[in-house]
Amino acid sequence: MFGEQLLKNPLIEFCDSVCRGCGQVMFQNNTVTGLLFFAGIFYNSTTLGVCAVLGTAASTLTAQLLGVDKPLVRAGLFGFNGTLAGIALPFFFNYEPAMLGYVALNGAFTTIIMASLLNFLGKWGVPALTAPFVLATWLLMFGVYKLSLFHPGALIAPALPSVAGLADMGTVTGRTFMEGLFKGVGEVMFQDNIVTGVIFVVAILVNSRISALFAVIGSLVGLCTALIMHSPETPVRLGLYGFNSVLCGIAMGGIFFYLNIRTFLYALGCMVLGAIATGAFSVLLSPIGMPALTWPFIVVTWLFLFAGSMFRNIAQVPTEKAGTPEDNLRSLAIGSR
């Protein structure tokens, strides 16, 4: 009773929406999950933590001010792209206090793009995923090169693809798997920290055991796919081939498809392709100094979702009804009675 009254307070309601927005980065509509995600980011970097909160708050507030349907805002669906957009700027550019205004601007811009994509993709029942974050961030990053707003970091220096870097393959050890597994989860939000990765897995576990399992499976599949395809050890250990597969795994592992053996194998294929696409888009974009971000996850997941409507042997969850994998299975069981 007290909790319900507390949530009616506009400030508390807004903070709850912000936390849920952060949780939705990995499809978790849960306040505690979002708080733990924020905690994991702050554990790794105070600067990235502040920008994550600011970006999420900016995108959520913009949605409220523009009159987006309240249930969508309260579920955090207009917050998660702001989270990623907020973190990306200080991650790829040398941080300075003036950047905070652009963090808020980037977060707010994701709301405009999100609304546009929902109107466009909603006709086919396909979610926008993290496309608003990628499009908004790419636009601002390209602008930085022309307008010299900030100083780009070493991570986005233009470079032609070369096989010379493949000469030093490194040695795969147990450390490669341990670090790569959890850093793959952490890198979903640009966190190169094994403890943060563990916190993220626990945060997902709070809301869904199945999603937590698929996050770990996705990271492992991305890691193994990269090693099988003879990737150098360092990017694998850093989780750089895991994070897109993590998102593919969670999305396909019971969120947008009812989970069974067929959809598990379908999700597995999506995870493998997510890792391959990570390498492909990284090569494609490196000459212009742009990071692939979560674009590999977006493209591969969209392909699998659009294709899913053609396959009679896998049952797709209507986008507007998608919940946790456990909730989706319960709904399916009730509907079949």
Curated annotation (Swiss-Prot):
Intramembrane segments: 11-26, 31-43, 172-189, 194-205
Localization: Cell membrane
Claim: Protease is one of the keywords in the record: no
Entry keyword annotation includes tRNA processing: no
Segments traversing the membrane: 47-66, 71-93, 99-121, 126-146, 210-229, 238-258, 264-285, 288-308
InterPro entries (UniProt xref): Ammonium/urea_transptr (IPR029020), Urea_transporter (IPR004937)
Membrane topology, as annotated: Multi-pass membrane protein
One cellular-component annotation, GO: plasma membrane
Any GO MF annotation of the entry: identical protein binding
Gene Ontology process terms (BP): protein homotrimerization; urea transmembrane transport
Biological function: Urea channel that facilitates transmembrane urea transport down a concentration gradient.
Family designation: Belongs to the urea transporter family.
Protein's name according to its UniProt entry: Urea transporter DVU1160
The species this protein was found in: Nitratidesulfovibrio vulgaris (strain ATCC 29579 / DSM 644 / CCUG 34227 / NCIMB 8303 / VKM B-1760 / Hildenborough) (Desulfovibrio vulgaris)
Taxonomic path: Bacteria, Pseudomonadati, Thermodesulfobacteriota, Desulfovibrionia, Desulfovibrionales
